[in-house]
From Swiss-Prot:
Full protein name: Alkanal monooxygenase alpha chain
Catalytic activity as recorded in UniProt: a long-chain fatty aldehyde + FMNH2 + O2 = a long-chain fatty acid + hnu + FMN + H2O + 2 H(+)
One cellular-component annotation, GO: cytosol
Keyword Flavoprotein listed: yes
Domain of life according to the entry: Bacteria
This protein's encoding gene: luxA
Annotated organism of origin: Photorhabdus laumondii subsp. laumondii (strain DSM 15139 / CIP 105565 / TT01) (Photorhabdus luminescens subsp. laumondii)
GO molecular function: alkanal monooxygenase (FMN-linked) activity
Phylogenetic lineage: Bacteria, Pseudomonadati, Pseudomonadota, Gammaproteobacteria, Enterobacterales
Family label: Belongs to the bacterial luciferase oxidoreductase family.
Keyword annotations: Flavoprotein, FMN, Luminescence, Monooxygenase, Oxidoreductase, Photoprotein
Function: Light-emitting reaction in luminous bacteria.
EC number from the UniProt entry: 1.14.14.3
Amino acid sequence: MKFGNFLLTYQPPQFSQTEVMKRLVKLGRISEECGFDTVWLLEHHFTEFGLLGNPYVAAAYLLGATKKLNVGTAAIVLPTAHPVRQLEDVNLLDQMSKGRFRFGICRGLYNKDFRVFGTDMNNSRALTECWYGLIKNGMTEGYMEADNEHIKFHKVKVNPTAYSKGGAPVYVVAESASTTEWAAQFGLPMILSWIINTNEKKAQLELYNEVAQEYGHDIHNIDHCLSYITSVNYDSNKAQEICRDFLGHWYDSYVNATTIFDDSDKTRGYDFNKGQWRDFVLKGHRDTNRRIDYSYEINPVGTPQECIDIIQKDIDATGISNICCGFEANGTVDEIIASMKLFQSDVMPFLKEKQRSLL
């Protein structure tokens, strides 16, 4: 069993940006003390939904501030920056941390990112696949060159080279069937969404495994991650109530940060996300409180035993044993840390014990 901690860097209305950055640093350091293997950093621009425009820089700080903790991105918006510059950053972090950096990628969901950084969002999938291919070759060969419809440049040496054999581990934030199939072709581990239920997670893994096996990958040796919003309290009602205000603002900020969910938006390649949003609306989840209530049904928010039951159900359905939680909805920094420590003492050991008994 492995455990990760998502650091969202969302700015609630009552907090300044300086307070959010202090929270990021403190929670990163505390994560190592609380037995988490990895912290994950999210890339966002131009929105309070996330203040971290450059996760590479934040990762460098946290890697330097810790001794054993892995630090990953969940995820870098791959098509909005030049692939050579990105590999230089990834290799540098891989070298300086002696292999503790994790390179999580996605193709992006937010229109402003693409407009400001000069990338056509309609091509996000093709660019992501192209950029990944260039970066992966650069990780193993030490050189990069390109001559295709998306990008052209002469062969260059990438410095520094990777520290880890084959390069820093790559993860993919995957929600749609097409992204799942693409990740499976390369045997890349997925970070599964916290907004889908157990049956949906199981179906996604079944699709992945079918494709991965066709491409010759050992599906029993792929480090997928289950992601969750998490709040642990001996009083289940308190666990839910402490998160409600944060999640309400956070959900609304997410919807407002992109026009993808607007029926008038014609951006190509996001049919899955638009369809998922329509399903939310039909279920009444456009109402923020109803979305929060549904989130509580499928995420570990409650007593330690309730959290164990929810996570173990997903572990048993998917076989995934890398559990990644986000605790920032728990209020103040002290309240967040208290929930993390209770998760460490009253949830982690029992998930490990049950997992061992299943082997």
